Amino acid sequence: YKPGERWHYSVAVDVTGLVIERISGMPFDQYLEKNIFAPLGMDDTFFEVPEDKTDRFLPNHFWNAKAGELGTMPVQNNTAMSDYMTVSLHSGGGGLVSSTMDYMRFCEMLRNGGTFNGARILSPKTIKFMTSNHLTKSLSASTGGEDPIAAAFPGVGFGLGFGITLDPVLTQTLGSAGNYSWGGAAGTVFWIDPVEDMIVIGMIQLMGSPWNLRQDLGIAAYQSILETNE
C-alpha cells in the first residue's frame, strides 16, 4: 500500500537500517558508532557485548506465576541473552545493549533538539517531525488497517520511532500531551516530556511482569513535580 493509506507495526526500521548501509557504504553497527554513539560519548552501547564487559551484562528475569516468584535467566544458558555475545545480524529494529547513562545521553540529545556533548546529531526540525503524531483518524483498526498501538495504549499515536501521547486521560496515567516514548519486551521504558522538560528512563529486566510498572513509574515521577510548566 502507499504511504498514508495504511499503518502496520512492521520491520520497517530494519529495512531502514539496510538502506543506511546501502547509502553510507558502511556496516550498520559501524555507522551507528561513528555517527551517533561516539559523538554522544555512549561508550557502553553496542550490538555485541565486549569480552571485557560481560561481567556487567545483567541477566534477564521472568515472572513464575505458578510459584509466585521471580526467576533468573542465566546469560550463558539463555538464547535471548547469549545471542549478544556473538552477533551476525545488526538489526535496525532491536538488538542493541546499553546502559542507563548511555541511554540518558541519547535522550538528552533528543530533548535538546538534536545536540548533546558538543555534537549535532539531528536538526531541531527533524526532532519535531519525528516526535509528532503521523497517524490520522482514518488509520485506525476499523478503517485503515492494523493499529495495535491504539488498541494496546489508548490515547497514544505514533511518530517516526516513538509512541506519542495524545490524551493523557485516555492513557490512564499521569503525563503530558506530546510525550514521546517507547518500551521493550522486558519492561525497559523511556519517555521525554517536552512540557515539563523531563526525561524518565526505566531499565527493567523482567519478562511477563504481572505489574503495571510503567504506569507506576509515571505516577511516581509526576507526583514529585510541585510546580508544573502547564
Placement of each model-derived feature along the sequence:
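Short, small/polar residue-rich loop motifs at catalytic or cofactor-binding pockets
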Residues: 184-186
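Short, well-ordered beta-strand elements
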Residues: 190-192, 197-206
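Generic C-terminus detector
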Residues: 207-230
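Short acidic, gly/pro-rich beta-turn/loop elements at beta-sheet edges
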Residues: 140, 172, 202, 211-212
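Residue-level detector of beta-strand structural context in well-folded domains
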Residues: 160, 188-190
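Short, structured beta-strand/loop micro-motifs enriched in basic residues and often containing a Trp
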Residues: 181
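Short, surface-exposed loop or secondary-structure junction motifs
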Residues: 1-174
